[in-house]
Amino acid sequence: MPPFRIFLLSPAHCGGKRADLLLSERAAFPLAVRLRSTPGVTLGEAFSFLSGLYFRGKLAYAERFARPPAGARGVQVITTDRGLLSGDAPVGVEDLRKFGTVDISQDHPAYRLPLERDTKLLRQVENVEVVLLGSVATGKYVDVLLEIMGERLLFPTDFVGRGDMSRGALLLRAVRNDAELTYQPVAGAIRRGARARRVSVEG
């Protein structure tokens, strides 16, 4: 088993009511105020607000179980137009607005090319497993990542058949119990399945 592990987190949706609330110039809650100031907030903070339980679970889980080699980032977030960024990367209002204008599709060069660039750099790191914490049922992330990473691209087996909220609860419970999930290669996996039993954070 490789001694190192890096997690790739799918992004939060940068549109909708929560994005409108966070990006509003009238918003007075602390995160929104910091977002409008320099240097802004971290990408992890912004996406945790936008996505709620699911991204919060992904971030907490990845931070707990990442085992990166020296000089590598153990937690990397897929973005719509900037490839892979650290969860600690600073972002401001304009960054989030731009994220919301780019479609996540392998047919969209603004999304695909930066992600290909950074994934190829990641492939050069030896003896590392890469775990995708995101949907594998569609090709929006997998089609780009799998072509480059091949058998080294893994995902949590228990993600199959779960929706976003259930995955978030599963990940937070794993962190609370200090129990890492089982992974399997994306290549050749059954990526859709019957709906899994609902999981609570406390359960």
What do the PLM-derived regions correspond to, one by one?
Residues 1-203:
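Peripheral peptide segments
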